[in-house]
Amino acid sequence: MHLSVIIVNYNVKHFLEQCLFSVQKACLGIDAEIIVVDNNSTDGSRAFLEPAFPAVRFIWNSSNDGFAKANNQGLAQAKGEYILFLNPDTILSEDSIENCLSFFKQHKEAGALGIKMIDGSGKFLKESKRAFPSPLTSLFKLSGLAVLFPRSKIFARYHMGHLSENENHEVDVLAGAFMMIPKKVLTEIGNFDEHFFMYGEDVDLSYRIQKAGYKNYYFAKSPIIHFKGESTKRGSLNYVRLFYKAMNLFVKKHYRGSRAGIFILLIQLAIYIRAGFTATGNLLKKIGLPVLDAVLILTSFWIIKILWSTYIRQQTNYSPHILYTAFPVFTAIFLIAAFYSGLYDKGYKQSQLIRSSFIAALMLLSVYALLPEAVRFSRGILIFGILLSFVLMNIMRQLFISWHYLETRNENDERRQTIVVACEKDFAAITQLMKQAGMPERVLGRVENGATTSASALGHIAHLPNLIKKYTVKEIIFCENSLSYKEIINSIAGTKAVVRNKFHASGSSSIVGSDSKNNSGDYVAATKMYNIAKPINRRNKRLIDVALAIIFIIGFPVFIFLQKRPARFYKNVFEVLAGRKTWVGYATEINDLPSIKKPVISSTALPIKLNELPAESLLKSDEWYATGYSAITDLKKIIKGFKYLYY
């Protein structure tokens, strides 16, 4: 056998589906096998993939022991003369594999071959070619000098910026996303080092290949797409921890003496600096807008109070103690109302601000009405303060949108801003797929790729840039059939317009894409839309969990007599309060539903241990619960199963 393709999968079944379609095409005419090692995915990968790809050999692990170990599992069963280690979130050109194999025939000294990679938006991924880490390269990267001098042989050495991305080069490090190696080389140097859990294994293997006297090459002729659909996001603290831990391990393994000591010190420093920036950035993303809103709301109340006492109620003296307490409390209530109304969900819509302000007004006026007469100040200040808050928050958001600091979502615009590059048959399949996925109608029309342009098409792909401008297109779905993978990749690499690109293999059941290398990819699939997956419902579910837990704690003298085993009941209360459990959840542990915490009682209103229905019926109960979820659903089931809350 000439080639073995080894792919490690973890919870990216839709990306892997598209990847396998492209790999199968790239392997046509080659004596090849495809091996997929699944690291205990929980997204239903087995049921989804195994029937769809009977020619692929699957290895299903019962635990996730890391990327390196999974690759070694596949390698142990591989029969090919050459081994291609490939990430599941990639799409290959039809000639990628053939061209790489030809390169090895022409370069007997080659020990490994990487390839030019672009992200879903068509941008070159710099990790396609790298140098080995060293104190100086790390310092230049950390200090930002590599960004200031991206083509410098000295400052940009980490990503070898001085080497053209469009030419073949001898390099140090190849990316594990696409790494082709002769099996005889692996037999000589050994397999992946399993001490590297998720990152660094490609650096270590590249180092050992070079140390054995072989050369590592970067191949620019047949670019591939790498979506970055992995579960550990680059912007997370977990990514920082895993990445720099891997670099630390690499240095300790391969470097010696004072050089190693300096480098390890630099890595430790980098961990703290990067973690600090990451934590600060994540914190600002989460609380930045609410904090600014709090300032605007508080300011609005004080402005209205000053105007009110100056022009409306000149003779009224408002107690500073009341105002210093009331205004911050009312601001907090406003923010809570805004949060649970979805104002801080991804993709801002003005309707969210209107709804949030209206709900906040109702809550504030209700709270104000319950206050004793002695501590009330003025309903007018409250009402006009809310109105001014709305105006200022709206102005701030419009400014942020114009400065591109705030992502906006306009459903009316999105409905007609997607075009599909496909033949008529595939276009019908894609529109049906989007309909089944429960997405709003947003397809503007079809773009032709044939010799002639039919009357039903908006235009020809040769005029794609003009079509993007004419129809203000925000998203393009490329279908592999009327276009080859190579044509699709070349098309997105050559498109300068800022659009979202998505990809669909003819006959597949999903559409995948990613806007940038820093974001995990997204997908459209013919799956049910679950209410329980919506951010607003997840917040409401957590609110019910916490509210009931607090009620049970406050009502301790009563509830202690209403439960058969009060100690176990209150153990559940505190676990729910801590976020380790939820009052109501699924009756089945293995399903393809949105994840929620371990439940006290299940969707049948019984504890999991007491469910006697067949597994199929329990799964159906869970699907109904997830699909039709509302806050009332949980309350009804808790009332029904109240006597079992001690389980």
Predicted regions and their residues:
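N-terminal hydrophobic signal-anchor/signal peptide
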Residues: I271-T310, I336, L343-Q350, S356, ...
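Short, acidic, metal-binding catalytic loop of nucleotide-sugar glycosyltransferases
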Residues: F21-D31
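Glycine-rich, basic loop-to-helix element that forms the pyrophosphate-binding segment
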Residues: W60-A78, N99, A462
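Short aromatic/hydrophobic "clamp" motif used to bind/position activated sugar donors
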Residues: I83
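Short, flexible, basic/aromatic active-site loop/helix in glycosyltransferases
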Residues: I115, F132-V171, K528-R538, V546-A549
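Conserved donor NDP-sugar-binding/catalytic core segment of glycosyltransferases
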Residues: I91-E127
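A conserved acidic beta->alpha catalytic loop
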Residues: S22, D38-A47, S63
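Active-site-adjacent helix/loop segment of glycosyltransferases
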Residues: Y207-T280
